[in-house]
Amino acid sequence: MGIKMAESSSSPRGSSLTRDNDVVLPDAPAISTPVKPEDDTNSRAAGVALEDLFDEDDDQLQAELVFTSSNTIPSSPPQPASDSSSQTIADTQQESYSDSGLMKQFYSRFFPFRSLFQWLNHSPKPGPDFGNREFALTLQNDAYLRYQSYPNSDMLRKDIIRQNPSRFEIGPVYTTNPRDRKTLRKSSMFRPLSKEIVFDIDLTDYDDIRSCCVKANICSKCWAFATMAIKVVDVALRDDFGFEHIIWIYSGRRGVHAWISDKEARELDDDKRKAITGYFEVLRGGTQSGKRVNIKRPLHPHIVRSLEILKPYFQQVLVDQEPFMTQAGQERLLQLIPDKALGDALAKKWASSPDRPSTRKWADIDSLAATGVSKSLDTKALMEAKQDILLEYTYPRLDVEVGKKRIHLLKSPFVVHPGTGRVCVPITTGGDMKRAEAFDPFSVPKVTDLFREVDLFSSTTEGEEQHQNGSAEDRVTPRKINDWEKTSLRPYVEMFDVFVKGLLKSEMTRVKRERDEEGVTGTDGMEF
């Protein structure tokens, strides 16, 4: 699959991109509490056949990849976390979700390390895509450890449990093992090679238009902005750029992250990443900078499509957020009306009805314009202004700096947000926008919920086993059930696994095609 670019080589705004002076993050600062460094012998022991750790599972995975479509949908949709009030270790941790003991149990029992490994490695067998990948750990004492790396999922799991970070982040694949960077003769030899394209959407960037919440707070009304952003960006990434392997992850509190894992995306240089992020820059400046949307006509196809997606949401925004109800909101709207006579007539009408709802004020624009209140009204300019207003109040507000450089680190899926205790679970993948629309951030399981659910599952299972009939010889030994499978985390891990299998299947197909083109036969050297 090649990357499809939109007809225009520039962003939908029609403006050129500028180079920002991004600063490379320095090495980790000295930590106040000594932390035992990773024993390099664990990751470099000579003669260790890492593949042997995975052979049995790899055979099973290859069979699954042959017969499983990447579009398979997990059988169980995400369900709200359990409301069980049973007493567990988690009961005393409601206000301390990053508690050391709680997090250690979470990593050892619930975190899907193997799935994460296969996603980042692009193969079930260890390779440089994982071994040369940077991880950064935020420890319980707030020390920040950069340039951590691991040869396989088992080593990652062991070190995460040992270090017990409050969270960890994922960085790029480097030219060499990040732990060896200081042994190189030239620092220029250590450079990022590849990384997923990532996008970050934070609802605090909507504070000037959301009236229901501010700062870190969210509710179902303002979460609609996240849903709008997912729908607009996802379809553009697929239809305009040709990307396929896109997954959206809940940040744990007030935002969403997009990860684009296609090989073509991972290998893009920083300039091309800036071009892609610039493609989505429609809003510029702040609320005090005048008109924030200045797009050329005729409209770019991406903007035309976005308007169609956003129109129904705009009407709901007028109801939920009442952006024009306040005097400041009303004045902001009037600033965006291109005809002075029409603007003056609207201001006069609204002055006599200060509590007039936003939906009525929006309708007043057309109704007053139709009365001929302005003799010089340019109806085309008014229509374009209304389109720009709709975009200002609904179009995605991306933190574009996050996606511009390969060196940028982003929080890993399935870590726990220390402030809310919620797990950073997948929202949707495969372009399934019904899943995105149905996602409820308040139903996402908290780390404390998981322990209660395991206890509830165990007690229920034991009761069922006591009522089973038949002799021990007649029973089939069931496979061991992972703890995450006993909780409301299960459908999210299943969704992630379907995404990973689709990616691995694509990688397998690509490798086989490349080998066929080179005239190589057999399986020697195959990554799979």
Locate predicted features:
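Acidic, serine/threonine-rich intrinsically disordered low-complexity regions
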Residues: G2, A6-S86
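Histidine-centered divalent-metal-coordination microenvironment in nucleic-acid enzymes
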Residues: E196-F199, H245-D271, K411
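Residues forming anionic-ligand binding surfaces in small-molecule and nucleic-acid pockets
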Residues: N71-P74, S84, M189-I218, L283, ...
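Extended, amphipathic alpha-helical scaffolds
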Residues: T429-F528
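Catalytic micro-motifs at enzyme active sites that drive phosphoryl/nucleotidyl and oxygen chemistry
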Residues: K182-M189, D234-R238, G242-Y250
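SsDNA-processing nucleotidyl-transfer enzymes
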Residues: E95, D99-K215, V400-V402, P418, ...
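Long, well-ordered alpha-helical scaffolding segments within enzyme catalytic domains
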Residues: N217-F243
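Long, charge-rich alpha-helical interaction segments
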Residues: F280-I389
